[in-house]
């Protein structure tokens, strides 16, 4: 299994816009891709705003390519996301998952920020 990691930053006032876009537009799209096994969106407040980390899980690099295309190390950042982020990684990092466990979550563990 492959874990794909991408980082970005947003202002406190725009972080919710990115979270909303990721959870209502991007994640539903990637869930339909063969070989996608899950995703996590992490958020932490930092001195100059909010750091966001997206972790996606894939069966293989072939599955990653179904999402990212022929340049799987290049980040896929939609224009709507670019508009609300102050910075983001142009390239992602891939890890081979060697062990792991996550309890099943039957519903979202968070509430989307109000617009």
Residue ranges and their predicted role:
Residues 10-12, 60, 96-99:
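Non-catalytic surface loops within mature trypsin-like serine protease
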Residues 9-22:
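Short, surface-exposed ligand-recognition loops at beta-strand->loop->(often short) alpha-helix junctions
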Residues 2-9, 40-71:
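Short, well-ordered beta-strand segments in beta-rich or mixed alpha/beta enzyme
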Residues 1-2, 18, 36-39:
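Short, flexible segments with low predicted structural confidence
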Residues 24-36, 57-94:
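An amphipathic, aromatic/His-enriched active-site/gating alpha helix that lines ligand/cofactor pockets
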Residues 16-18, 49, 64-66, 102-104:
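Short acidic, gly/pro-rich beta-turn/loop elements at beta-sheet edges
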Residues 40-50, 76-115:
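Glycine-rich beta-strand-turn "strand-cap" elements at beta-sheet edges
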């Amino acid at each position: 299994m492959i874990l794909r990691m991408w980082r970005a930053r947003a202002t406190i006032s725009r972080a919710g816009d990115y979270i909303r876009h990721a959870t209502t537009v991007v994640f539903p799209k990637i869930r339909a891709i063969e070989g996608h096994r899950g995703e996590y969106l992490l958020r932490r407040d930092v001195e100059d705003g909010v750091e966001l980390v997206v972790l996606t899980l894939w069966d293989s690099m072939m599955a990653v390519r179904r999402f990212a295309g022929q340049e799987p190390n290049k980040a896929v950042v939609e224009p709507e996301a670019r508009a609300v982020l102050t910075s983001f990684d142009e390239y992602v990092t891939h890890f081979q998952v060697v062990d792991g466990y996550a309890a099943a979550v039957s519903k979202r563990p968070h509430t989307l920020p109000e617009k």
